[in-house]
Amino acid sequence: MTTQAIHSVLAMMNITAEQAAGNTLTLSAPATAGAGFMSELNSSIKQINGMQIEARRKAEKFELGVPGIALNDVMVDMQKASLALHLGIQVNNKLINAYQEVMNMAV
């Protein structure tokens, strides 16, 4: 897996997270050398965590009977958070495979 492919996957994760959060789609410029891969990865992990926290909060509010919280909204938010987590796990697996492939290359 090339670095371009990794950046592409991370960009798709960010777009998916933005869409799941209900934000408008914004395409950002490629990360600068200072921002780097690690900051993109941390940002994606924080977005996934934020989605899960928000889904849990909405579920708790629904369980407490707070007006304005519908079951379908709770279920959709929980599915979005679950999907984002599974996507993050798949990206993690791909990164590990890419790392192992690079480490096994003959010099």
UniProtKB/Swiss-Prot annotation:
Entry keywords, A to Z: Bacterial flagellum
Localisation: Bacterial flagellum basal body
Gene Ontology CC entries for this record: bacterial-type flagellum basal body
UniProt entry tagged with the keyword Mitochondrion: no
Lineage: Bacteria, Pseudomonadati, Pseudomonadota, Gammaproteobacteria, Enterobacterales
InterPro entries noted in UniProt: FliE
GO biological process: bacterial-type flagellum-dependent cell motility
A matching Pfam family: FliE
Family stated for the protein in its record: Belongs to the FliE family.
Highest taxon in the source lineage: Bacteria
HAMAP family found in the cross-reference section: FliE (MF_00724)
GO MF annotations, alphabetized: cytoskeletal motor activity; structural molecule activity
UniProt organism field: Sodalis glossinidius (strain morsitans)
This protein's name: Flagellar hook-basal body complex protein FliE
